[in-house]
């Protein structure tokens, strides 16, 4: 298995992975997530893949077929009256194909993202995770992430 930057040829598989992510959330919260859907279409992915501020990494099998992806976004807080000036690498989306789970692909992807973030000199890695996605929460905790803030809701 190899981790590399995603390329245009990976878009069909990335779209499939995005549907898998959506369905995890839809199955847990059908009141919020439509399912089956993707957060980006192929044209949007082409733009994202070309942008150095939004690197996407894939972990591929021996045939260069993506088994998982990690969408990242470089963020920087500057000139804020309350917050310090820091650079953050935000993980917008991370997924391992249903058929490839249990093979440590998620760990390999996360460790690659972590090494990339260090090489870019960012202060931290951040992400959001839905509380209904307990598997993801456990994975992120195992990777060393700690809660930074909590979003809450009251359904009326």
Task: Enumerate the language-model features and the residues they cover.
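A short helix-loop-beta-strand connector motif used in the catalytic cores of GNAT acetyltransferases and
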Residues: 43-58
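Conserved acetyl-CoA binding element of GNAT-fold acetyltransferases
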Residues: 84-98, 153
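Conserved acetyl-CoA-binding loop of GNAT-fold acetyltransferases
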Residues: 5, 122, 141-150
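A short beta-loop-alpha structural element at the N-terminal edge
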Residues: 2-17
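Conserved glycine-rich acetyl-CoA-binding loop
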Residues: 65, 93, 97-111, 118-120, ...
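Conserved GNAT-fold acetyl-CoA-binding loop/helix
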Residues: 23-45
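Conserved beta-strand-loop-alpha-helix junction that forms the acyl-donor binding cleft
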Residues: 126-136, 153-156
